[in-house]
Amino acid sequence: MQPSLLDRISSVTGNRSKRHAKFRLGRLQQPPTESTTRLAISDGAQAIDETKSPRQSEPGATQCKSEGSGDDIADGPQPMPAPNEGDTPTLDELQQGPNPRGSGIVSGWKLAAVLTALSLAVFCMALDSTVLSTAIPKITAEFNSLHDMGWYVSAYNLTISSFSLIYGKLYSLYRVKWVYLSTLFLFEAGSLVCGAAPSSLALIIGRAIAGVGGAGVFLGSMIIVHEIMPLHHVPLFLSLISGLYGIASVVGPLLGGVFTDYVSWRWCFYINLPIGGVTALIIVLFVRPRARDQATVKKTVWAQFLELDPLGMVLILPAVMCILLVLQWGGAKYAWSNWRIIVLLVMGGSLALTFTVVQLWQGDRATIPPRIVRNRTVWGAIVFAVCLYGSFTVFTYYLPIWFQAIKSASATRSGIMNLPMILGVVVCSMLSGWAVSRVGYYVPFMYMAPVVGSIGAGLLTTLHVSSGPAAWITYQLVLGVGTGAGMALPLVAVQTALAADDVSTGSAIITFTQTLAGALFNFVAQSVFQSRLVHNLNAALPGVDTARVADASPMEIRSAIEPEYLPQALDAYSVSITQVFYAGAALCALAVFGVLPMKWLSVKGSRIQPVAHA
């Protein structure tokens, strides 16, 4: 039996009489006067400003605020204030029960359905990043488009990176449910265009559309999880969804190969359509949209457009694309001294600098509000996410290359051999999310990630041609356990440290930096590998033409050199890859510097939403 509103007020106000509770209830139910925007709810001068969203902790949890730079958040556990000394719940909170955050708490089988739908949507979105790796040969043969091969992957990844910040603005200003459904529609439309593509150009356009939608699907899934359950349950389910992202990275090539060999490469995209349809139906039925901020509702269309920071959007999109194209083409398709690379580098740098100036000038209307970035928990989470995810990307790409080149593994088998790391990430990610939900604090587990992860990464640098399964399985597990412990926690930290209205923007910043870091350090690793491979081959085989080995794919190096030189070539190849692992290990260790400035905040708390009046 649900307690009455009167009983809830009585329980909040401690050992007070029901008579006093009735008085407080009457005060709560009085309509606001036109001369004030504050709702008086106690005897003294106490009031709750309707424009703020402070967090009120449960007993034993951290008491904090999320205004300004975030430096006013108290460190460590704080006792609950007496009823007359702290924040008092609003009428909406007392009517809704505990944790009335965002769109409303979902529980039971409805919660399970929503979480399953979100997980499947993120899985499909992540799958699209790697599913084409084994299907590209068939696609290029069908369209006779070998020169377009790079764009099949880049068109998707570029748009995901570029649009992440824009969706942060949209989710903060409009109802999360409807923005999410719009992005899901875009992702599905892009998948349909790709599946039915009659030409290479149509496939590239479809990939770009899917990327625009995919950026919003991933970010929106994280935000919906934050809105439909109490804050202390969020870490577990964010970790679950992040783990699925890792699984999709490995399963993608396997699934793409199965579709290509037994059905058609077009099913790499058609598979998204029924899953997206089911996800949309569940979101429509079970997720209650968050009420829009009344100040935003009352603004004109033009004023709302200005709130989206259109100037910032115009600058950030080409800036990111220029920088990523420089990293993709530089030293590979074109020399670093080529005029195309120089022009892109100058344009990207100039646009990025101009974007920074615009963000400082725009203030709270900026795509990346300076006050949010100044919050030390937020910028610590950014540093942590960049280093940890960059390290994870390096090992995700180059461990399979080591297996293919050194152990003669096929693409499919190399993915299977990479499973110890992925399983370690997924399992430990879920365990750390569960532990944070139980303990309340995420900082200890964020320290665990770079410490354990860098040990595993360091061990992987010792791999050599004769290393057996015992070595590479154990080392991968250690790396996976460390990486998994912190994979989802930057989002948890940001969502805990910020006020409810800033969560979508903070989450977008973390998602953007993670995606950009993955692309950035993948290209950096590629540059390191190519330069070290040429150097090591020339040092191991002086006087021998090693250009064919340097240009060969990992599975072709045995046929690219004479048998008598193969042992030295394999050793040089292995050393070149482990030298890339040094960069990954260093990145993983540097993630600890992102944890140091973070405040010890507890997830065992709830936000008090402002009372909205029509």
Curated annotation (Swiss-Prot):
Superkingdom as given in the UniProt entry: Eukaryota
Record's keyword annotation contains GTP-binding: no
Biased amino acid composition, Basic residues: 16-25
Pfam families: MFS_1
Molecular-function annotations in GO: transmembrane transporter activity
Keywords: Glycoprotein, Membrane, Transmembrane, Transmembrane helix, Transport
Name by which UniProt lists this protein: MFS-type transporter ausY
Similarity section: Belongs to the major facilitator superfamily. TCR/Tet family.
Coiled-coil segments: none
GO cellular component, one term: plasma membrane
Localization of this protein: Membrane
Annotated transmembrane regions: 105-125, 151-173, 185-205, 209-229, 236-256, 267-287, 311-331, 341-361, 382-402, 416-436, 439-459, 472-492, 509-529, 577-597
Function: MFS-type transporter; part of the gene cluster that mediates the biosynthesis of calidodehydroaustin, a fungal meroterpenoid.
Glycosylation (residues): 15, 375
Bilayer topology: Multi-pass membrane protein
Family annotation (InterPro entries): MFS (IPR011701), MFS_dom (IPR020846), MFS_trans_sf (IPR036259)
